[in-house]
C-alpha cells in the first residue's frame, strides 16, 4: 500500500495462500492444487478458479469480518509474538524499566480481567470530571491539546510529517477528524443501510454514556449533543476521493496567516499546551473542516461540547476498560459496522495492544528469533530485478516522451529500499509501564508516541525511520521519502518461499514489490519528484495522456457491482488499481527475464506462466461479510480481494496467453478497451 501522512498505513486485506500439508508441492512450485476450483473456468472468474478450493475449505469464523490467507499469516505472526511476550510476562525478576518489564507487565495488565471488571469506569472518572469542570470555551483549546497527547482526538488530528513541498524537513500538520463513525458518509447518506448504522450508533452512544455513569435521560441528551457536533463536522469534511488530492490537501501557512484565516481559534493556547512554542508554520490539510471546528467551538453551548469531549474519552478508552465497555464497543464497531459475530479472545487483544504500544521493542525480539538473514539477501536480489524490469518498461513506453522518461528513470534509480527491519531502533526508556490501570498505561504509551512525534517538528526528516514494525504483515511506499519497505513478517511463506521456484515468488512477493514501486508513478505518486517533493516533472502532453489512460481504469472499476446495487469506486481505488496493474506487468517481465537463465518446467500440469498468475490470485483468496463489503467500499482505497484478481487480470495480455482466454470468455476485454499505463 501507499503510506501517506494522512493514512498512516499493501492493505490489511492483502492475502495469500496458507500453509498446507503438501510439503512436496510447496517445495516444487509453491502452488497447492487444493486451492483451486477446477469446475470453474479461468476466463469466467479466475478468482473462483484459483481460490475456490481454498474458500470452500476455510469457512469464515465468527471472530472475523473477513478472513484470507493474509490473516493466516497474521495469526502466525501473532502466535509468534505471544510466545515472546508470554515468556516475559511469566518472569518475576524482570529489571524495573527494562524492555522485558514493560512488555511483560503491559501484557499481564491487559490479561487481568478480574481487576479490569472490578475497576469498571473508575479509570476514566477523573478525566470525565476534569471535562465537567471546564469553565469556559477558552479552556477547550487547552483540553484538546492535552487529550491529543493521550491518544484522544476530538475535533481534528494534529501530527508531524514531511513537508510535501520541502520533503527533507518535517512540519506540523492538521487533518480532519472528530467523527465517531470515522467517515463522513455515515452521517450524510440516507440509504437504508447507512440510516440503520446511524440509528445503531445513536443507541451505542446512549449505552456508553450510561456505562460511564449517566442516567438514561442525561445519556440521551448527551447523544443528541454528540450527533449534532459530529454531523456539523461531517458536512464540512472532504470525501475520501478528495482526500487523495495532495495539492488540495497542502495549505501551508505561517502563524500570522493561520491566525488571520482562523481568528476565533486560540492557536497560542493550543500549540503552547502541545509543546510547540516556537512554531513557524503549519499545514492545514482541510481548511473548511478546520473552519467548522473553530465555528463549533465558538457557537455550540459549552455543555454540549463537554458531552462531545467526554464521548471522545469514553470511545478512546472503551477497549481498555471492563468487559461491559469492551462488549458494547465490539457490538457497534465490529458487529454492526463489519459483521463480526464474536470477539477475539483476550490474549489476542492483549498481544495486539503490546505490539501497538511497544512496537519496535517487540519487533527487535521478533527479528532476533524469527527472521533469517537469507530471506533478506534473496529479497535484495528480487528488488533489483524488479527495479530493472520497471526501468525497461518505462524506456519502452510509446505514449511517454523522452524528457518525462528521463525524470521517471531518475526517480526509479533513487528509490530507497528497506527490507526486514530498521538499522536503528526507537528508544522507549522514557516510557513507564506501571501497576495501575490498563487505560493509564495506554495513555502513557500514547504520550510517549506524541512526544516522539513533536520532537521532529521543524527538524530534518530521518529517512532511516520505519513507518511499520518488522512484525507487520504488510508493505508500503512513502512518496515524500521515495522509499519502498518490506517488513520481516511478510518475507515468509507463502508470500515469499525460499524453497519455492520463481513462478510462485514472482507471482506473490514479486507483484508486491512491483506494486509498491508502481505507487511511485500512480495518480498520486507521479506528482512527487525523485526527492519526494510535490513538484510537477511531467510535460503537459504526457500528463494528459496519463490521465486519459487512468480514466479507463476508473471507468472499468466503476462498472463493477460489488454487492447488489453497490458499485466499486473507481476514483477512490485508482492508485491501488494502478499499482496492482503495474506490479503484475513489471513482475511478469522480470520473471520471464529470470527464466532465460533458469528455465522452469511444467509442474502439476501448469506452465510456469500459469503458476505465476495462480500465485498472484492466491494472494487474494478469502472470505468477506456483506457488512464489510459495504464498509470498505465507502472508505478503503483498495479494491476488494476478488476484484484485485478479476478486475486486474483482464488488462494483462500475458494472462490471456497463459490460459488461452478468448473473446468468448466473460472476463475478456478487447485490447482497445484495456488499461495500459506502466
Question: What is each stretch, according to the model?
Answer:
Residues 1-7:
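Bacterial N-terminal signal peptides that target proteins for export
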Residues 15-18:
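C-terminal motif of bacterial Sec signal peptides marking the signal peptidase cleavage site
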Residues 20-22:
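Bacterial signal peptide processing site
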Residues 24, 38-44, 49-114:
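Active-site-surrounding "flap" and adjacent substrate/cofactor-binding loops of secreted or lumenal enzymes
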Residues 88-381, 385:
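Noncatalytic, helix-rich "gating/capping" subdomain that lines the substrate-entry/channel surface
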Residues 226, 261-264, 283-287, 344, ...:
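Intrinsically disordered, low-complexity linker/terminal regions across diverse proteins
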Amino acid at each position: 500500500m501507499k503510506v501517506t501522512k494522512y493514512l498512516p498505513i499493501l492493505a490489511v486485506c492483502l492475502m495469500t495462500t496458507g500453509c498446507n500439508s503438501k510439503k512436496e508441492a510447496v517445495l516444487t512450485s509453491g502452488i497447492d492444487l487444493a486451492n483451486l476450483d477446477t469446475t470453474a473456468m479461468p476466463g469466467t472468474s479466475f478468482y473462483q478458479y484459483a481460490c475456490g478450493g481454498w474458500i470452500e475449505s476455510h469457512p469464515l469464523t465468527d471472530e472475523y469480518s473477513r478472513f484470507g490467507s493474509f490473516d493466516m499469516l497474521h495469526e502466525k505472526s501473532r502466535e509468534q509474538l505471544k510466545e515472546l511476550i508470554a515468556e516475559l510476562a511469566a518472569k518475576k525478576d524482570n529489571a524495573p524499566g527494562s524492555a522485558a518489564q514493560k512488555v511483560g507487565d503491559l501484557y499481564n495488565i491487559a490479561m487481568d480481567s478480574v481487576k479490569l471488571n472490578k475497576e469498571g469506569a473508575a479509570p476514566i472518572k477523573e478525566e470525565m470530571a476534569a471535562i465537567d469542570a471546564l469553565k469556559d470555551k477558552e479552556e477547550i483549546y487547552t483540553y484538546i491539546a492535552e487529550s491529543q497527547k493521550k491518544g484522544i482526538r476530538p475535533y481534528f488530528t494534529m501530527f508531524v510529517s514531511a513537508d510535501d513541498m520541502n520533503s527533507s524537513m518535517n512540519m506540523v500538520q492538521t487533518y480532519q477528524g472528530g467523527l465517531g463513525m470515522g467517515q463522513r458518509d455515515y452521517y450524510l447518506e440516507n440509504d437504508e443501510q447507512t440510516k440503520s448504522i446511524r440509528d445503531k450508533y445513536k443507541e451505542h452512544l446512549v449505552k456508553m454514556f450510561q456505562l460511564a455513569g449517566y442516567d438514561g435521560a442525561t445519556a440521551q441528551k448527551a447523544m443528541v449533543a454528540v450527533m449534532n457536533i459530529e454531523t456539523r463536522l461531517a458536512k464540512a469534511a472532504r470525501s475520501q476521493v478528495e482526500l487523495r488530492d495532495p495539492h488540495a490537501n497542502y495549505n501551508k501557512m505561517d502563524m500570522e496567516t493561520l491566525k488571520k484565516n482562523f481568528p476565533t481559534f486560540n492557536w497560542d493556547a493550543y500549540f503552547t499546551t502541545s509543546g510547540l512554542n516556537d512554531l513557524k508554520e503549519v499545514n492545514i490539510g482541510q481548511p473548511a473542516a478546520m473552519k467548522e471546528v473553530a465555528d463549533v467551538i465558538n457557537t455550540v453551548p459549552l455543555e454540549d461540547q463537554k458531552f462531545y469531549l467526554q464521548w471522545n474519552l469514553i470511545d478512546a478508552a472503551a477497549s481498555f476498560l471492563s468487559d461491559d465497555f469492551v462488549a458494547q464497543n465490539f457490538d457497534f464497531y465490529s458487529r454492526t459496522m463489519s459483521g463480526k459475530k464474536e470477539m477475539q479472545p483476550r490474549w489476542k487483544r492483549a498481544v495486539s495492544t503490546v505490539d501497538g504500544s511497544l512496537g519496535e521493542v517487540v519487533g527487535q525480539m521478533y527479528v532476533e528469533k524469527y527472521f533469517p538473514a537469507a530471506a533478506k539477501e534473496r529479497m535484495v536480489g528480487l528488488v533489483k530485478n524488479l527495479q530493472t524490469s520497471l526501468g525497461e518498461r518505462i524506456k519502452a513506453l510509446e505514449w511517454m516522451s523522452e524528457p518525462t522518461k528521463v525524470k521517471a528513470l531518475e526517480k526509479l534509480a533513487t528509490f530507497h529500499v528497506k527490507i526486514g527491519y530498521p538499522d536503528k531502533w526507537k528508544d522507549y526508556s522514557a516510557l513507564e509501564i506501571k501497576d495501575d490501570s490498563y487505560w493509564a498505561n495506554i495513555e502513557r504509551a500514547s504520550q510517549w508516541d506524541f512526544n516522539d512525534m513533536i520532537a521532529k517538528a521543524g527538524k530534518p526528516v530521518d529517512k532511516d525511520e520505519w513507518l511499520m514494525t518488522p512484525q507487520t504483515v504488510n508493505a508500503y511506499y512513502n512518496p515524500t521519502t521515495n522509499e519502498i519497505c518490506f517488513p520481516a513478517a511478510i518475507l515468509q511463506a507463502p508470500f515469499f518461499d525460499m524453497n519455492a521456484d520463481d513462478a510462485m515468488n514472482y507471482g506473490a512477493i514479486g507483484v508486491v514489490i512491483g506494486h509498491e514501486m508502481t505507487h511511485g508513478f500512480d495518480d498520486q505518486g507521479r506528482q512527487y519528484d525523485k526527492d519526494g517533493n510535490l513538484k510537477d516533472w511531467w510535460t503537459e502532453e504526457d500528463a494528459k495522456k496519463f490521465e486519459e489512460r487512468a480514466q479507463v481504469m476508473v471507468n472499468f472499476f466503476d462498472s463493477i457491482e460489488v454487492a447488489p446495487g453497490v458499485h466499486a469506486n473507481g476514483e477512490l481505488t485508482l492508485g491501488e488499481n494502478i499499482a496492482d496493474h503495474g506490479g503484475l506487468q513489471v513482475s511478469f517481465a522480470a520473471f520471464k527475464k529470470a527464466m532465460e537463465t533458469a528455465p522452469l518446467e511444467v509442474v502439476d500440469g501448469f506452465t510456469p506462466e500459469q503458476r505465476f498468475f495462480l500465485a498472484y490470485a492466491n494472494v487474494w483468496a478469502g472470505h468477506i461479510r456483506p457488512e464489510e463489503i459495504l464498509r470498505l467500499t465507502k472508505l478503503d482505497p483498495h479494491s476488494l480481494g476478488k476484484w484485485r484478481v478479476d478486475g486486474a487480470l483482464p488488462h494483462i495480455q500475458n494472462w490471456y496467453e497463459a490460459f488461452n482466454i478468448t473473446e468468448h470468455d466473460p472476463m475478456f476485454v478487447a485490447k482497445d478497451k484495456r488499461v495500459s499505463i506502466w
